């Protein structure tokens, strides 16, 4: 929802661009819906799909996979499918580190995670040399990444709709980028795993691949009740009202 609103704000009324925004109907916040659906511009097209975020994303990815089609319309993406977004997100890991850490001190980052884009940017920052100890994948009840780290099996379940809708995702697109990396940049092996996911509904990582992930990541999830409790506690102690994603 936030990405869609920001993209519309950047592209509306541009003569040589059109933007098509997909969102799952009735599964984003009302303010996000209003931001995206009330812009009066001839080059903005908002499409509400009867489904969830994963289904919206699958539809967009299928268009990118059709090379002839995507090239013919000069198609680009504005969420973390686009590598540029990951590159930009890398910056604030460095900024945050230099604001809070001592020289060469290793710190942990806890990142509310849905599509694995933001936290993957942290992983890239670590690979660039930033002294990060662990990246904590913070999830809601859609805890596929936590389950994968614990078992090595990536198996999407039915999406649970929560008070943290930006994390209501079972197929985290950017996790494929991490899989490619821990598979020693073996594109054929990565493709096989992705085909397993599409055809069998799951794939399994080898022990060495899972070990590489655990060296850099850990994960925890919060229930709806736990999320609301954190919001109450922070407000009680700090007089700051945080949103559910921050609470997680």
Residue ranges of model-derived segments:
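PLP-dependent amino-acid enzyme catalytic core
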Residues: 2-248
């Amino acid at each position: 929802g936030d990405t869609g609103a920001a993209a519309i704000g950047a592209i509306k009324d541009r003569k040589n661009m059109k933007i098509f925004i997909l969102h799952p109907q009735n599964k984003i916040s009302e303010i996000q819906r209003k931001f995206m659906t009330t812009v009066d511009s001839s080059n903005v097209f908002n499409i509400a799909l009867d489904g969830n975020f994963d289904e919206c994303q699958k539809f967009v990815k299928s268009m990118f996979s059709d090379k002839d089609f995507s090239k013919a319309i000069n198609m680009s993406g504005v969420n973390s499918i686009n590598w540029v977004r990951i590159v930009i997100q890398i910056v604030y890991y460095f900024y945050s580190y230099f604001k809070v850490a001592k020289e060469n001190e290793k710190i942990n980052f806890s990142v509310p995670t849905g599509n694995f884009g933001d936290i993957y940017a942290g992983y890239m920052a670590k690979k660039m040399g930033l002294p990060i100890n662990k990246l904590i994948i913070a999830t809601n009840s859609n805890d596929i990444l936590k389950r994968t780290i614990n078992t090595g099996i990536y198996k999407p379940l039915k999406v649970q709709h929560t008070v943290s809708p930006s994390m209501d995702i079972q197929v985290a697109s950017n996790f494929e980028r991490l899989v490619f990396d821990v598979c020693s940049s073996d594109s054929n092996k990565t493709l096989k795993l992705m085909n397993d996911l599409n055809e069998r509904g799951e794939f399994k990582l080898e022990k060495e691949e899972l070990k590489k992930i655990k060296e850099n990541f850990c994960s925890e999830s919060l229930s709806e009740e736990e999320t609301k409790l954190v919001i109450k506690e922070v407000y009680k102690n700090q007089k700051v009202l945080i949103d559910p994603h921050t609470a997680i």
